[in-house]
Amino acid sequence: MAEVGEDSGARALLALRSAPCSPVLCAAAAAAAFPAAAPPPAPAQPQPPPGPPPPPPPPLPPGAIAGAGSSGGSSGVSGDSAVAGAAPALVAAAAASVRQSPGPALARLEGREFEFLMRQPSVTIGRNSSQGSVDLSMGLSSFISRRHLQLSFQEPHFYLRCLGKNGVFVDGAFQRRGAPALQLPKQCTFRFPSTAIKIQFTSLYHKEEAPASPLRPLYPQISPLKIHIPEPDLRSMVSPVPSPTGTISVPNSCPASPRGAGSSSYRFVQNVTSDLQLAAEFAAKAASEQQADTSGGDSPKDESKPPFSYAQLIVQAISSAQDRQLTLSGIYAHITKHYPYYRTADKGWQNSIRHNLSLNRYFIKVPRSQEEPGKGSFWRIDPASEAKLVEQAFRKRRQRGVSCFRTPFGPLSSRSAPASPTHPGLMSPRSGGLQTPECLSREGSPIPHDPEFGSKLASVPEYRYSQSAPGSPVSAQPVIMAVPPRPSSLVAKPVAYMPASIVTSQQPAGHAIHVVQQAPTVTMVRVVTTSANSANGYILTSQGAAGGSHDAAGAAVLDLGSEARGLEEKPTIAFATIPAAGGVIQTVASQMAPGVPGHTVTILQPATPVTLGQHHLPVRAVTQNGKHAVPTNSLAGNAYALTSPLQLLATQASSSAPVVVTRVCEVGPKEPAAAVAATATTTPATATTASASASSTGEPEVKRSRVEEPSGAVTTPAGVIAAAGPQGPGTGE
């Protein structure tokens, strides 16, 4: 019985150790799964030396064996229960290790009651079943397949594949089963059909860009510019340009300025030119350095034709070599490497390179030595000109159709405009002279650079802009012209007076006066009025005091329409008081220069007492044929209006009564004689008529037609207008 009990206990222990849920096997599996959590192995104990075998244990009673068996059985049961309790913990730990595996989170999936971080490149979404588990279970809904969605990450994008038969909505767009993988945006929402289950997807992947290198300065090391500007040659700087068409040229009567008059202006131009040359050379040097920096890096992507000549390309290629020499194939390789345009362009540019190498004297052919491998000769740059050619190798050439670079303030030509006699400071040595069309450069600018130049320009009595014809060198640029001042003496101009009518508008009664004159060469009509009554009731214009000359004589005048006729206003002379004369109406001869024909018309009419302070019309300062004097304060109580010849004829032909004014003074017995004397002195060139004398009752009479009376007739109305013809100083009383 003892053997049977011992055998049964040993079998029970063996069964416990070999069971799947054995604590030993579970511990071994846990140690394999979690090596860090496994306890360190116990140090090996030294084995005792071999000796006599131990005595066999005493035999146990059957109860003890049964107890041992029962205890062993109980221990086996307790072991089974311990293993059964430890198994779910191990499964949960394994699941947690899958979901919380080390590594950065790639995406986040959020639901109503969960949040899942995607750390693996592929995740499956569905519902758990006996056939297998998924990474993210969405519950037990039958509308969700066991494997419904699969999310995969392929840097830098996420892709979604639908595996469920019901499909899925992605931001409202239906994705069917078996459709190609859909690239997901940064954020989107999944919704399972026929359910309210939603998953919010958010990408957490951010591509870590390498930190940008700090920007280095464009020109870290700029050596000081060493520029040598030779002394300018006046003959080379002066570039006379023909006068453009359509401009106003200076009159030939003005004397030409001497050759050395504008020498100081060259100093001003030289300063501006030197500044512009400095700026241009600095820009060229900066462009060459920038081009050199870009050529040292990767191949440029600009496929446009480079703005360099073939000779410049050859110089760039040869100067980039270490030994300053290249073969023809090396030159080709350098050009195609740095300028992609020549990679796809026609091969004709290679012929141009060969022609430049063979025909340009700056390129020297060096034969290859026998020791050097390869074939073909080397090309070098002439050492005498290498520095200059390398400096100009990256200077962009001027495009076609664009004007060449020139100094905006071009050098002044020696043929500058003469100085104005009234403004000597304008042509001072500092300003250098006013620019005329002949001295303007092709790209010249009329804007003054000197601050005093503008003020001096403003002092010019008259300047104007002239627009050149299209196509001329200075087209579309204003040209400042200096016009010489006009001579002080008034030149007689053939100004034709049309027949006019001067009508008084404020006198209550009197005469309707009509003045007709034939095209004299006189510059103005003069009307004389005064508030004091003359001796015979008329306004009298006299030659002057007894013994006086016409230069000192004049009258208080009122210029009628001189501005309309384009004549200048200049100071005039008038009497302080108008002398009263006898009953003779006198005429005034022309005061023009001798030999210049002309007529001066003086209109005389009855004077009316005028109240002071009403309608003061100031006398403007004018000039009568170049004579000067002091104007007087005269009151113009009448408003005059000039009418056209058609209006005059219409007035004469109309049946309406003429404008009448009341007679102020009675006519003396000397008036007819004075009228006869005035009529006898008139010339055929001028004629005046007076019509419509008033009756004693003040009522107007019917207008009578104008008739030409014989020279001997003495019947003249009381109101007379006398006209003066060219007569000598002794003519008239």
Swiss-Prot record:
Annotated region described as Required for interaction with FOXO4 and MEF2C, given as residue ranges: 95-420
Start-end of Low complexity biased regions: 676-697
GO cellular component: chromatin; cytoplasm; nucleoplasm; nucleus
Record key words, sorted: Acetylation, Activator, Cytoplasm, Developmental protein, Differentiation, DNA-binding, Host-virus interaction, Methylation, Myogenesis, Nucleus, Phosphoprotein, Repressor, Transcription, Transcription regulation, Ubl conjugation pathway
Name of the molecule in the record: Forkhead box protein K1
Residues annotated with Phosphothreonine modification: T245, T247, T422, T436
Subcellular location: Nucleus; Cytoplasm
Post-translational modification: Phosphorylation by GSK3 (GSK3A or GSK3B) promotes interaction with YWHAE/14-3-3-epsilon and retention in the cytoplasm. In response to mTORC1 signaling, phosphorylation by GSK3 is prevented, leading to translocation to the nucleus.
Gene Ontology BP terms: canonical glycolysis; cell differentiation; intracellular glucose homeostasis; muscle organ development; negative regulation of autophagy; negative regulation of DNA-templated transcription; positive regulation of DNA-templated transcription; regulation of glucose metabolic process
Basic and acidic residues bias spans: 700-709
Phosphoserine PTM sites in chain numbering: 101, 213, 223, 239, 243, 253, 257, 295, 299, 416, 420, 428, 441, 445, 459
